[in-house]
Curated annotation (Swiss-Prot):
<feature type="region of interest" description="Disordered">
    <location>
        <begin position="119"/>
        <end position="142"/>
    </location>
</feature>
<dbReference type="GO" id="GO:0030490">
    <property type="term" value="P:maturation of SSU-rRNA"/>
</dbReference>
<dbReference type="GO" id="GO:0005829">
    <property type="term" value="C:cytosol"/>
</dbReference>
<dbReference type="InterPro" id="IPR023799">
    <property type="entry name" value="RbfA_dom_sf"/>
</dbReference>
<keyword id="KW-0690">Ribosome biogenesis</keyword>
<comment type="similarity">
    <text>Belongs to the RbfA family.</text>
</comment>
<comment type="function">
    <text>One of several proteins that assist in the late maturation steps of the functional core of the 30S ribosomal subunit. Associates with free 30S ribosomal subunits (but not with 30S subunits that are part of 70S ribosomes or polysomes). Required for efficient processing of 16S rRNA. May interact with the 5'-terminal helix region of 16S rRNA.</text>
</comment>
<feature type="compositionally biased region" description="Polar residues">
    <location>
        <begin position="123"/>
        <end position="142"/>
    </location>
</feature>
<dbReference type="InterPro" id="IPR020053">
    <property type="entry name" value="Ribosome-bd_factorA_CS"/>
</dbReference>
<dbReference type="InterPro" id="IPR000238">
    <property type="entry name" value="RbfA"/>
</dbReference>
<dbReference type="InterPro" id="IPR015946">
    <property type="entry name" value="KH_dom-like_a/b"/>
</dbReference>
<protein>
    <recommendedName>
        <fullName>Ribosome-binding factor A</fullName>
    </recommendedName>
</protein>
<keyword id="KW-0963">Cytoplasm</keyword>
<comment type="subunit">
    <text>Monomer. Binds 30S ribosomal subunits, but not 50S ribosomal subunits or 70S ribosomes.</text>
</comment>
<dbReference type="GO" id="GO:0043024">
    <property type="term" value="F:ribosomal small subunit binding"/>
</dbReference>
<dbReference type="Pfam" id="PF02033">
    <property type="entry name" value="RBFA"/>
</dbReference>
Amino acid sequence: MAPGRRVERVAALIRRETSELLIHGIRDERVHQGMVSITNVEVSGDLQHCKIFVSIYGEEIQRSEVLEGLEAASGFLRGELGRRLQMRRAPEVHFHLDRGIEKGTSVLNLLEQLEQQRETLGEVQSESDQPTTDETTTVNKT
């Protein structure tokens, strides 16, 4: 099996098992303060390090507390991953906040605001494009 393929398989397994552990395994209350979604998992080529990218729904204070809880549980998570995946050495787990969903939402909001401005300007311009009665009579006389 090619090393790249193995790394991808291990990353997918880590994502699945970590999701399961987030729901049923981690008892730290900080982790359950916000809605946590695993967006991506990157594993190093030697399978010794693992970056887990998470999206956390909630206020900034909640996000930082949830991230602290996840970091505190990383040792437990590493042990469980090693046991569940039957790996000789489980990778070190590092959590990173993924702000991609947040950025996407802000872009969509900006696009919506632009659309509303266009509609407002379009209504104003269409009203100003209407010929006045003097212009209408002038056009009809020629």
